[in-house]
Amino acid sequence: LCIQQAFYLALQKKKKVLVLDMDGQGNTSSRLAPRRELEDGDYEPILTGTKTAELFAYELDGIEVMHCPCGADLIHTPKNDPDLFEMEAVPLDQAMNPARHLAELFENYDYVLIDCPPSLGRKLVAALVMSTHVACPVKLSGFAVDGVEGLLNTIIGVREAYNQDLEILGIVINDMDRSVNHDKALKSLENTVPDLLFENKIMHRPPLDTATTDGIPVWELRYGHVAAKEVEAVLEELLEKVG
């Protein structure tokens, strides 16, 4: 969702956007960054500037953002970055460093999007400490409710301890299909956290997978209009909640 949101804000809304990739897999970085074509026809991202893992240092000599083809700026994470995975072992006070280093830079942007791993750990804490709002995209499964409860408890804990202005926008149902299992999981969430569910949902749509994998806006795909409509509805609802 973060990748399509970056495209939407930068290209459709013409906003000044910074994306901070805090997921060690680096998928957002590889899709947004400039790319070069390899001999086998595949592509590899050209990653420059400050890495997300470097933000955890106590001292940092300036931050260099990367300019992406879509118009957004990016602080990147290389694919499966061991340096960022290692940040899970740092002392809790070190997770406060990115917020300290980035505060001034954030002032230059209309929106800052932080892509976070779904796991509860230092990277999530670091992201929540410097956020104004948080939205949780959730894939439905038998464990969706357990996962959401754990995540919400962490968010509330971080809010109480470090960032009392943090606002929980809610839960976005992502990649939903018409199966009995998904329907059951959705009903379970509706019973557990009814006030937190976004009205709009993103269904399982192959064009959205294709667009995200290829690093292009879903609305640019000829056959992607249904997926594009759903993504746009969710993003508009999100922007409305942010106000």
Show which residues each predicted segment covers:
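P-loop NTP-binding core
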Residues: 1-243
